[in-house]
């Protein structure tokens, strides 16, 4: 298996962009290149890599339109960052220390930090700090995405502000506890709040725990619908900047526990060999000769978090069941994808938690939504979802996830 010319050009552009360099591409279709970059939330970096090359003169109208897109995206990110920083100060003033994770912490590793786009800002709070942090957000004009009486049953709550740009997700647990396979991922971070690090005015996890979280977060999305190239960039840059602060043997042991070691090794290989992020991996990581190309192709095809199309999104229930079966040894048929267990449905349809007898109605609502979505998207069908799910299950077997 190998990358096609369009995929090669895209990876070259990303590599150049995250290093602040120019990308000289061969026979590139720049319209397709920018479309892929949009899907991957990497347009600012890709555009920055090609805007000073001879391609500009040959595609002036296209480049002018993309330039405006980039300006809008970066400006929006800058405003969102500033608003989040002001909000975070409110937590600190009250003696609260929510942990900042993902995009906000990773963006500072890039040459142009606001080119690293984030749809939201994520904070991880202790049980004791959850309601105080919620109250501060509400007092500062934010609105929660769930009613007050459901707050304590949620793993995460999203907050938005009218006429504001910030979108904050507050996590009581870093992984969704309604999906059985993620419960043991949460256990790795039980003591995270006892080992905080201060970084540029934010509290975050120590470098090792952050590395583990980035890998497991990527793993969570991969076994669902897929992951994007941006996550490879984040993990690679984190590895490079914090090589000496990461306990690599322990990291391998932790990843092995959840069958994510080969998957992580493939990501490190992509970062090293395709994205030009240089860092030395000690044993046992350095011993892996796993092919990373299948993972790379799947990630380019799927877009950020595998959200490029409904076929891929709908295939996720099948792949998730396959992963669960591999983890607990319990065989699950296609019916478990159509009729998920009550614990899963409670998280998606809150009325099931209040009235368990409405579970059949929630199943019906879920099926109706699927029928509506497939009707609106002619390229999507149950057969195509099953076909893609089988293909992705084989991919997961390549990395010993299943």
Please name every model-derived segment.
Residues 1-119, 125-402:
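Conserved NTP-donor binding/palm subdomain of two-metal-ion nucleotidyltransferases/polymerases, i.e.
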